[in-house]
Amino acid sequence: MSRRGTAEKKTAKSDPIYRNRLVNMLVNRILKHGKKSLAYQIIYRAVKKIQQKTETNPLSVLRQAIRGVTPDITVKARRVGGSTHQVPVEIGSTQGKALAVRWLLAASRKRPGRDMAFKLSSELVDAAKGSGDAIRKKEETHRMAEANRAFAHFR
């Protein structure tokens, strides 16, 4: 048995303007090549565009979008007797939020156009309404888990 203690979970810091952890999670995931100031610019422009499009609180739209995309269950590949099975596994809220942020950004990057702030704002608004690629990804994951429910005992 290991004598080491378990590492403390790091709490996500909040961003300087909105004091919101979700915004900071988005910033850290959108970050490329260490350009954090550019990541902040993209996120803040996207938030302003959400404000203009919906004329509601953009942070509530962000929260609603992430809540809509967050999966409850996912599948993990597990090897049993020479064959690999997709085993459905429930995931916690923190991991679910991380997946949701990743899926939202991936769906935003896939959208046509050049301006990332515009693409991200459009994806967030769509996700808050219950449509968009990120929502489709969540539904696809849930379908996979449902289809492989027979392998749930392999956990």
Curated annotation (Swiss-Prot):
It is found in: Plastid. The keyword Calcium does not apply. Belongs to the universal ribosomal protein uS7 family. GO terms for biological process: translation. NCBIfam families: rpsG_bact. It comes from Cuscuta reflexa (Southern Asian dodder). It comes from the Eukaryota. The keyword ATP-binding does not apply. This is Small ribosomal subunit protein uS7cz/uS7cy. GO terms for molecular function: rRNA binding; structural constituent of ribosome. GO terms for cellular component: plastid; small ribosomal subunit.
